[in-house]
A protein has these predicted regions:
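Conserved catalytic core of nucleotide polymerization and phosphodiester-bond processing enzymes
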Residues: 1-189
Length: 189
């Protein structure tokens, strides 16, 4: 989100403020979810023309995003589904609905589904890898819970360092993408 803020707000990366990063996060996720300049203005408390300028600048700086959105929308309308990066089909039955509001919601879902679905596929692969490693190593640590892109593992004190070291490697290795996956680990009570 910091690099988006740097591009959209014409600010050096190391000078991006927390507020600019927060706004860039709203822009990044909002536009992918189909938010209009009007919605962006409301969400961020901005004048509509200012929000529209941010949207224009975003698509100017990141033209691939607009191409992706248009291509995905057209593909979904033609096939009735979209796919994750791993080929899992996500059906979008309302993509050709005659009612514009229903169709627009399906278009937003079609654009978002490959990203959310791919993220879901990756975390599931990570869960399988972590569980297999815990079993193979015969550790007492247990995979307890998955929350969005996080895995919660319960480990006895004597296994914490080993799990802390191995978990990010297993999670980052869950998929080979053109952009590396980076996983952080935290320890808490």
């Amino acid at each position: 989100h910091r690099s988006t803020a740097a591009e959209v707000f014409h600010t050096p990366l190391d000078q991006v403020t927390p507020d600019q990063r927060r706004m860039a996060k709203v822009i990044n996720f909002g536009l992918i979810y189909g938010m209009s300049a009007f919605g962006l203005a409301q969400q961020m408390g901005l004048d509509r023309q200012v929000a529209a300028a941010y949207v224009d600048e975003y698509f100017h700086k990141f033209p691939g995003v607009k191409r992706y959105m248009e291509k995905t929308r057209a593909q979904a309308a033609e096939d009735g589904y979209v796919e994750t990066a791993f080929g899992r089909r996500l059906w979008v039955p309302d993509i050709t609905a005659p009612r514009p509001m229903v169709r627009a919601a399906a278009e937003r879902a079609a654009i978002n589904a490959p990203m959310q679905g791919t993220a879901a596929d990756i975390i599931k692969r990570a869960m399988i890898a972590v569980d297999a490693w815990l079993r193979t190593e015969k550790l007492q640590a247990k995979l307890l819970l998955q929350v969005h892109d996080e895995l919660i593992v319960e480990a006895p004190a004597e296994e914490i360092e080993l799990v802390k070291q191995k978990l990010p490697e297993l999670m980052a290795g869950a998929a080979k993408l053109s952009v590396p996956l980076i996983a952080d680990v935290g320890v808490g009570a």
